[in-house]
Design a protein with these regions (language model features):
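Register position in tetratricopeptide repeats
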Residues: 13, 49, 66, 82-87
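Start-of-helix register in tetratricopeptide repeats
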Residues: 2, 35-38, 72
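Short coil turns that delineate tetratricopeptide repeat
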Residues: 32-34, 68
Length: 88
């Protein structure tokens, strides 16, 4: 799972968000809790970079429900709520 997260980060940096999402999906089944947290956060980032704010918002809400102690994710969730409500 760690390797897939690394690949996903490279894909995000290179602007290949679909490949990043594919690598995240491949990494999730074998991920430890910490790896899953990283993969799922990067999934939010990838959807946001694709300008798919609705999906990013859904993923961010699920993430915050699973990892409520993650303050960065809470800020991301608040940001995404502003992006989706203004598109509405």
């Amino acid at each position: 799972a760690k390797g897939y997260n690394g690949l996903a980060l490279c894909d995000i940096r290179n602007g290949d968000y679909d490949s990043a999402l594919d690598n995240i999906t491949k990494g999730l089944p074998t991920a430890t809790t910490d790896e899953m947290q990283s993969l799922l956060f990067n999934e939010i980032v990838a959807y946001e970079k694709k300008l798919d704010f609705a999906t990013a918002l859904t993923k961010a809400q699920e993430y915050v429900d699973m990892f409520p102690e993650d303050s960065a994710a809470k800020k991301e969730l608040a940001f995404l709520k502003t992006r989706t409500s203004s598109e509405g």
